[in-house]
Amino acid sequence: MLRRRGGPNELRDELNNSKNQPEDDQRTKRGRESIGFRHWIYFVLTVAIVYAGVVALHRKMPAVRDGTSFEDFSEQRARVLLKQLTALGSRPSGSDNLEVKAFGMIQDRIGKIHSVVDEVGVNRLESDVQRPSGCFDLKFLSSFTLCYHKITNVVVRIGPKKGPSGNSLLLNCHFDTMPDTPGATDDAVACTIMMDVLEVLAHSKTELENDVVFLFNGAEENFLQAAHGFINQHPWRHDIRAFINLEGTGSGGREILFQAGPGNSWLLQTYLENAPHPFCSVLAQEIFQSGIIPSDTDFRIFRDYGRISGLDIAYTKNGWFYHTEFDEEWRIEPGAIQRAGENVLAVVRAILKSPYLEKPATFDEENRWVFYDVVGLFTVYYSVNVGKLLNYIACFATYFLVVLRIRNRLYSVGDLAIAFKHHVVAFLAMVITMLLIIAFVVQMDLVMCWYKMPEIVGALYVLPMLIAGAIVHSHYADNNRIRNVEMVQYDTILLSFASILFLMTFYNLSSAFYVLNNLILPVFKDIIIWALGLFGVIRRVTPRVLFFTQLFCFLPTFVFAAYAISQCVDFFVPVMGRLGNAINPEFIMGPLGLVIASGFILFVNNLFYISRRMNYIIRLLFAIFALFILVLITTKVGNPYEYSHENPRLRRIIALHANRTIYDFEGHLTQKDNALFVHSLDYRGASDLPDHSFLQGSSAPNCTGVVDEYCRMPYYTAIHELFPPEQSLWVPVPSPVVLPYPIDLKLVSRHAMGENLNLTFEIRGGYDKMSLHVTPLNDYDLLSWSFTDIDIKEFGRRQTYFVFMTYGHEAPEVRRFWILLKNKNGVAPDPEKHENIELSVATHYAHGIYQDTETLRQLRAMISSRRQTPEQAVGWWRWGITMVGGRSEIVVKIF
């Protein structure tokens, strides 16, 4: 006859007679049927097999299709243009590589496709070159203003031959890059995918139901300027009803749908139903939209300025290569382009046929879908309302189960309280362990030791926290006096998940699906045991039956956990290399390890109470951890950076060879110097750079008495909050920078009007990237200016306002602007006698023949040589560097 825990009353009574007494429970625990070492080996092997299977599926790519058939997308065809674009090298907006060479390649391909459309005779194709100018305000990393002049957009529209349908789908990519990167994944590959999709549609012998607009934009890396120019100024913008934005923040791998909306849930549903290789998660959307990721895409521009709903899709694997010299075509593995192209083509075809494309956009509609893929095999999606219902049902079913057991005297509320105390103490022990590990890492100068090898996070943080949690629960198990202790501990697991699920649902977090998946099957553990007994599979409930049933119930949990962990570690570890100097990344990776470790302990803690003593296993784990620490501090395993041809894991730096001139209120030159302005993009900072004559006598800039938030430094963009001036280096060098276009800043007029002061300025010279620091002085505040209709309340009042000015195809002869200041005291002092405003104008030569000086060329050569031979001297691993560089000038004047 079956002995079991919980369930129908007649079986529960038999279970109680055999198992309810604490002394019987303790004897069972120490007996031959209790869980032993080999069962924990089974458990670890199961988790390892699940993780390996998940990773294998995560890396699986479809076969590359032959390029001779135009019925389907072909990576083989797409790579031809990709190789051509990346062979040009870096392509910043305004460079010859972009404005002439890459532009010519794209135009040439469009011309050939136009001939195909004319030959087939079913559809029509139009193309246009747009060169917009404009300004807008942006809150990203900081608050700043962007102005652009004649940047380049190449726009193509294909649709039914009878004429524009009035309803268009927009596909967007950008073919410009950051300086010093060939930009294969960011974002040339997206443009080649779009080009092949266009070619497939061009060969179609079936008339398209609606139009598709392809935007090849040439100034995304200037903070989304080209998308802004298109959606605000191009005549085709009025017919666009939805968009797909293609991006890249890594190199290859599977592209993920990480943003959808706002509103227009049919658009998301179309992707979920039609993409043959889905990879998506509402959890990724909520993380990205929270702002913790230092990145942004054109999705924001189309959403905020065009009020259009869309899909944001990006490559994220190998983020170490993002915005570096290593973002190369050959690093994108075969099949990665094929799967993205097949997904995009299938979704485009489905959207064009959708009747919803013709309906007015429900833009203000909230997200209505919970969606995620299951290891890339299929997608699960349901409405938010259905999700809330499922979540609350799962919560109340759990609460009902616990109440039922309390009423049937299987355990008491006091027993639950004691079990929760076990969880709290275990969690506190893990938190303390995490903090001790972080302190050890900082003290031993091991910060970011996991950067080149993400697996170290598991050994450094997860393992010791697992040991801490196991010690606590093992101690309580050895001193247990609760009857049915395993049941009590297990039910507190369910209560914990149910409570978390309830709170996430209450606060409208769609990512609550993840907790729901961890709760559904474990709730049915006892029912499964009852069914096994009913069909004669088991005769009685033993610790081993409980173990294997729980292992089965938690298999989906392990799959989802392994999937989430592999994605989070793969994504977040490389991001730490560009997160800046303000946040110690150990306080990000440590809590990430805590989530993994505490989740694992929570899943299995009840098994400690039906196991033999855990002392041997704990000692073994501690010995493994001690051996790991020894290896970490005595070998190169603990070095955060390492160069290899296949997998470079390098420190990012920006090095600008700059001339700086400073003038006082009277117009007298007070300071003129030449230096390397260097900042490291990760937390180890510029002070961690290797010792060399280039850096001898260097120190952080002296910002004493400087009002400018940017410390009168030639920042490329407004990133001083992530990379503060005091964390950078100002390295004096003897050689001045030869400047082909020196900056000439002049005051044109100055008019006082009561408490207001209007100043008009002109800037001549400078290159295609220019930064303006506007710092009001002597109780003045910025009221307005000619760049934008700035809303100070929305924008945020600042000590220094930053304007990033660029040009693309053509340079402006002069930049003329006015600034209106308001005095806080109500009466403006005599502007002729008092300082009113400080302007700093910096320009950057980030491409072409003017980019490098001899000093920068020597620095590049030294980095390239020494990062390949770190074994030649102690500490040479610090030469594991990848560099963005250029010449620069900054002129500071007080008016």
From Swiss-Prot:
CDD domains tied to this protein: M28_Fxna_like (cd03875)
Catalytic residues in the record: E220
Any one GO BP annotation for this protein: proteolysis
Region Disordered: start-end pairs: 1-30
Listed cofactors: Zn(2+)
Site feature location: Transition state stabilizer: Y322
A single GO molecular function term of this UniProt record: metalloexopeptidase activity
Chief place where the protein resides: endoplasmic reticulum
Free-text remark on how the cofactor is bound: Binds 2 Zn(2+) ions per subunit.
Transmembrane segments annotated in the record for this chain: 35-55, 384-404, 424-444, 453-473, 493-513, 518-538, 545-565, 587-607, 614-634
Ligand binding (Zn(2+) 2): D186, E221, H323
Cytoplasmic side: 1-34, 405-423, 474-492, 539-544, 608-613
EC number of the protein: 3.4.-.-
Protein name as it appears in the record: Putative endoplasmic reticulum metallopeptidase 1-A
